[in-house]
């Protein structure tokens, strides 16, 4: 089953009418993944025996019988969950993450776990124990990261929807690089229980699909309260599909100078064209400033690395995960297991975080970073007092070549300069396809105030209806 021209509504109609059975859909999906993944390497685990739930009611749940991909840092009962790390190469969870339980209740079919940067730390899906994932638009390019496997699986027509996680842009940047829609909800909108932790104050599970409405359908299911996660909001979840097809007349759209100045040439023209489309439809365009954007990258890497160094202390070779052989004593077990189990990028982040949290550095680095984070939040609050959404480029460039930046951490980190601030502020943000630059997709980022994902869906759906990017086929998947 190839999903390049399918969406959740079209599949639901075929399933409900009997034109297609959920069993056949699952089998055909797995077969197509195995065939096309020879090009992409988007999957770590493919479930050969993937089966739909019994007694599916297609009239009550749009997700009934729909195959969905899961990023491999989201816990799945009885299905190997590795976070793309040698440290967890044999980890078999005994419970489901809350989002998985909710999707099962809705009747979704799970077909496997997607590739990613190890422990979600990366921007290219090259930092994976299972090898790099390839971009469906050009197999020599990266798919972005860390949710690159999920993005490539959707863009390559392997599935119609996938879950990802976003700590500093890990849903939006791959969505932009692969020409799909990806949304990071408000921090606290979706339960993080069962998400393998990277940066606990930044992490958020989100959705990646080819069509905007499909993400709304999935977010309807996974959003909402959870007794296992004290940070998740218990506020009522609106029906996000109600924002699809709405008019944007009168929508107040802020365009940050700092974001537009970060791009030039053809890329700026593509982004500006989408902004002009909103203006032509009656949206009110306001140029604004987010002055602390220039501090976002160093601020993020101090906070995220500090939280990561704490979260990753649990991987010691004792309770679970990789355990080194030929060790002499307990300390040797710790040192060798972590040295051999973690990849280079993980060790780099642990060292950075441990330094920032050390007694002699805490006040100079982590405490100062927390203050800068507050200033970034204040910037957004001021803008949203007079605007409904903020739009601009998702990334500063289209997808780069595999191997081009993997050995240059500073250059790799700067890929996140336009996405990081939304995580620091905890606001919802998404990327919707804007067009092509040199044959590769670029995305328009849309941000809104906390818990106003509806404005994002309204804006993104309008852009999608206008440019119809979903009609394009990734050139790397053409026979």
Curated annotation (Swiss-Prot):
Single GO term (MF): glutaminyl-tRNA synthase (glutamine-hydrolyzing) activity
A UniProt-annotated Pfam family: Amidase
Source lineage: Bacteria, Bacillati, Bacillota, Bacilli, Lactobacillales
One GO cellular component, as annotated: glutamyl-tRNA(Gln) amidotransferase complex
Enzyme Commission number(s) of this protein: 6.3.5.7
Protein family per UniProt: Belongs to the amidase family. GatA subfamily.
Highest rank taxon of the organism: Bacteria
Active site: residue positions: 71 (charge relay system), 146 (charge relay system), 170 (acyl-ester intermediate)
Reactions it catalyzes: L-glutamyl-tRNA(Gln) + L-glutamine + ATP + H2O = L-glutaminyl-tRNA(Gln) + L-glutamate + ADP + phosphate + H(+)
Organism encoding this protein: Lactobacillus acidophilus (strain ATCC 700396 / NCK56 / N2 / NCFM)
Assembly, per entry: Heterotrimer of A, B and C subunits.
Enzyme class: ligase
Protein name, per record: Glutamyl-tRNA(Gln) amidotransferase subunit A
Free-text function comment from the UniProt entry: Allows the formation of correctly charged Gln-tRNA(Gln) through the transamidation of misacylated Glu-tRNA(Gln) in organisms which lack glutaminyl-tRNA synthetase. The reaction takes place in the presence of glutamine and ATP through an activated gamma-phospho-Glu-tRNA(Gln).
GO biological process: translation
UniProtKB keywords: ATP-binding, Ligase, Nucleotide-binding, Protein biosynthesis
